[in-house]
């Protein structure tokens, strides 16, 4: 991909303009979700061509509007300096790159946001508000465009590439692993453990005509020029993958990206992995690489039931093969087993790298505990939009 497209001129806001926008922060906090929900409705009706870049399930649940509202609020609070939210911004950049977001889509979002503010706030969204907001939005949009252009340059390929399904393996009663290889024979590079790939699914449903974008973690190292993803049946697309996808089917795939990557240069000798349910998928290559590097690895693995626990045999064998270097701690909700913070009391931040992924409530509980314990570099990410609740 070429150099970043210059769609907006970055013009620093004046102190007066910053104060004006920040004075509206309470309004954005209170009405933000209404504004963003209105924005998406307006945008999808006015610019239907962008629908295929959005997960419509996250629209129906309200998760995507909630995340965008949180993003706008945080941006307004940090207009002087984005450094405190740089991690959050970086996750947005990588998700945009994984989905193949183009610079030309930013004016569409900007115009839709302005219309939504006018509809929700009425006279409060006057000419002065619109002028200052457009200036601030343009600064943020061009910053993201520039950052995304830098990421695109590092990816293994541009755009989406057709992959063929080569194998389907049932890992649990509701989890299927999908093996895929490039149709054109492109040689896949080794992954960085923790990366994910984005897909554009046509699920052949007469009631759902839009292409469905989804992101899935790569659940093992590249072998035989194949990626593997492992998908739990919990939604429209995952149901299609588990019940209707067939060997030989073709699906477009974007190059890997990710924020929760294995830290191969860390000098710490121990790794603790906390995985809830299907959050185990990116942890598999992370665990394997950590063991190859000679680290002691502890896995705290929570599932609803034995029947819904993927990779049970794999981890059992891994524990046997590694002579005490890998310790598996299983927690099954149906058996009244639950990971407790007391199980993690021994984790010394100076000795352990810690990885965390699972349902939002699970992540919130253990992130709060681990950060309070002094784990300042906790490695975690979110399935779906970056969640403001965690």
UniProtKB/Swiss-Prot annotation:
Any one GO cellular component localisation term in the record: cytoplasm
Subcellular location as annotated: Cytoplasm
Domain FAD-binding FR-type: 158-263
Co-factor note (free text): Binds 1 FAD per subunit.
Cofactor annotation: FAD; heme b
Database matches in SUPFAM superfamilies: Ferredoxin reductase-like, C-terminal NADP-linked domain (SSF52343), Globin-like (SSF46458), Riboflavin synthase domain-like (SSF63380)
Free-text function comment from the UniProt entry: Is involved in NO detoxification in an aerobic process, termed nitric oxide dioxygenase (NOD) reaction that utilizes O(2) and NAD(P)H to convert NO to nitrate, which protects the fungus from various noxious nitrogen compounds. Therefore, plays a central role in the inducible response to nitrosative stress. In the presence of oxygen and NADH, it has NADH oxidase activity, which leads to the generation of superoxide and H(2)O(2). Under anaerobic conditions, it also exhibits nitric oxide reductase and FAD reductase activities. However, all these reactions are much lower than NOD activity.
UniProt protein name: Flavohemoprotein
Organism encoding this protein: Candida norvegensis
């Amino acid at each position: 991909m070429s150099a970043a497209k210059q769609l907006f001129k970055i013009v620093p806001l004046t102190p007066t303009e910053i104060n004006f926008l920040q004075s509206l922060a309470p309004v954005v906090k209170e009405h933000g979700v209404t504004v963003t929900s209105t924005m998406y409705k307006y945008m999808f009706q006015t610019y239907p061509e962008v629908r295929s870049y959005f997960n419509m399930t996250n629209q129906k649940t309200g998760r995507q509007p909630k995340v965008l509202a949180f993003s706008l609020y945080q941006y307004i609070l940090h207009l002087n300096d984005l450094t405190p939210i740089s991690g959050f911004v970086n996750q947005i950049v990588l998700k945009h790159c994984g989905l193949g977001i183009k610079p030309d889509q930013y004016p569409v979002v900007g115009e839709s946001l302005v219309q939504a503010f006018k509809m929700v706030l009425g006279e409060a969204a006057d000419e002065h508000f619109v002028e200052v907001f457009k200036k601030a939005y343009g600064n943020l949009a061009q910053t993201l465009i520039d950052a995304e252009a830098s990421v695109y340059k590092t990816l293994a390929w541009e755009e989406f590439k057709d992959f063929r399904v080569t194998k389907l393996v049932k890992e649990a009663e509701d989890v299927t692993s999908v093996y895929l290889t490039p149709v054109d024979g492109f040689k896949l590079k080794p992954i960085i453990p923790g990366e994910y790939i984005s897909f554009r699914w046509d699920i052949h449903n007469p009631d759902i005509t839009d292409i469905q974008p989804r992101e899935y973690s790569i659940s093992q190292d590249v072998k035989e020029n194949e990626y593997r993803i492992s998908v739990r049946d919990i939604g429209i697309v995952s149901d299609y993958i588990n019940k209707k996808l067939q060997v030989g089917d073709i699906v477009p795939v974007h190059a890997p990206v990710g924020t929760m990557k294995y830290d191969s240069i860390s000098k710490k000798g121990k790794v603790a992995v906390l995985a809830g349910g299907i959050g185990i998928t990116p942890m598999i290559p992370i665990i394997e690489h950590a063991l190859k590097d000679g680290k002691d690895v502890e896995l705290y693995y929570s599932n609803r039931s034995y029947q819904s626990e993927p990779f049970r045999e794999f981890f059992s064998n891994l524990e046997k093969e590694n002579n005490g270097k890998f310790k598996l701690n299983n927690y099954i909700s149906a058996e009244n087993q639950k990971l407790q913070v007391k199980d993690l009391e021994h984790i010394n931040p100076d000795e352990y790298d810690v990885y965390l992924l699972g349902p939002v409530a699970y992540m919130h509980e253990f992130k709060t505990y681990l950060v309070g314990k002094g784990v300042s570099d906790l490695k975690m990410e979110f399935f779906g939009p970056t969640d403001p609740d965690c």
